[in-house]
Regions:
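Nucleotide-activated sugar donor-binding and catalytic core shared by glycosyltransferases
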Residues: 1-293
């Protein structure tokens, strides 16, 4: 069998696989409204492609509706497979950083995009009135933007330090920029209040489950269309909060600072949902393949 994942659908490959009578399965299918409009523009071609799927596992109800309209026949709404991911142990933060963080009130802005860092800078200035030892950690989505981020934050009158293992971090640092890839989990393990970027700008948001599994309380903007059902679950369990302004973000962060991190009960709930989705997926794939062979 051939498996296509998420929204990675390759028409030529699908047509060739069908000629060879190889079963085609869509796993964790996700069709956004934007991509549905694109597929719908070539309606006859789209139906020819989606009709070839022997089985489609949808990650949400919206995708079920779109898949039907695009010509897919057997569709199962099992939920988002991202619930089933497990987190490896995070790298440890260097001792000098750990020591520095211990004397600070720390929060983190992760996977930030253009303009979102400025919002975090304004939030920092507001919170600094209440927490004089505040430190804001920014992990940009694209680290090549670090110099321009630093410049913009300096214009707000903030003292910025970029990650450098050799140099000492000045005690009056306001913003610490992580300008290296693969370090996010280390900071989730340490910061329990996290803003996830790509959600103020119209990008569709970032997957929040990783942060939730590390026990973080999550802030996000209004644009989270890529992970709608996950954020609904997190909002219902009081793990995440939507923000629309620096003032609103500051208020919620004050609440987060006074609360405990996400409970083990909620983490277990996330894992149980993931296991159920995996079990249904395995069962249905095995049934299909038995019938096809």
């Amino acid at each position: 069998a051939a498996f296509f994942i998420d929204s990675e659908i390759w028409p030529n490959m699908i047509l060739n696989l069908k000629k060879k009578k190889i079963p085609i399965i869509l796993i964790n299918g996700r069709i956004t409204h934007k991509s549905f409009i694109r597929w719908k523009f070539f309606e006859n071609f789209s139906k020819k492609i989606f009709d070839n799927f022997n089985l489609c596992f949808s990650s949400n109800k919206e995708t079920v509706n779109f898949l039907k309209k695009l010509g897919a026949k057997k569709i199962l709404n099992v939920g988002n497979l991202k619930f089933s991911q497990t987190e490896k142990k995070s790298e440890k933060i260097q001792e000098n950083l750990k020591k520095f963080f211990k004397s600070k009130k720390v929060w983190c802005a992760s996977s930030t995009h253009f303009n979102e860092e400025n919002l975090c800078g304004l939030v920092h200035k507001e919170l600094k009135k209440k927490y004089t030892n505040l430190l804001t950690i920014i992990i940009p989505r694209h680290i090549n933007r670090t110099p321009s981020i630093k410049k913009d934050l300096n214009k707000l009158g903030l003292k910025v330090h970029t990650q450098d293992l050799k140099s000492k971090i000045p005690d009056d640092t306001d913003i610490y920029i992580v300008n290296a890839y693969g370090k996010t989990k280390s900071f989730y393990n340490y910061c329990k209040s996290v803003f996830l970027g790509g959600s103020i700008i119209n990008h569709g948001g970032q997957n929040p489950l990783e942060a939730a599994r590390f026990g973080c309380k999550i802030l996000h903007g209004p644009n989270v269309s890529n992970f709608k059902e996950i954020y609904t679950f997190l909002n219902q369990n009081k793990i995440s909060s939507k923000i629309t302004s620096p003032k609103m973000m500051s208020k919620i962060l004050v609440k987060f600072f006074s609360k405990k991190s996400v409970s083990n009960k909620v983490k277990k709930k996330i894992n149980n949902i993931g296991q159920k989705i995996l079990n249904v997926t395995y069962k249905e794939v095995n049934l299909l393949l038995k019938n096809e062979i």
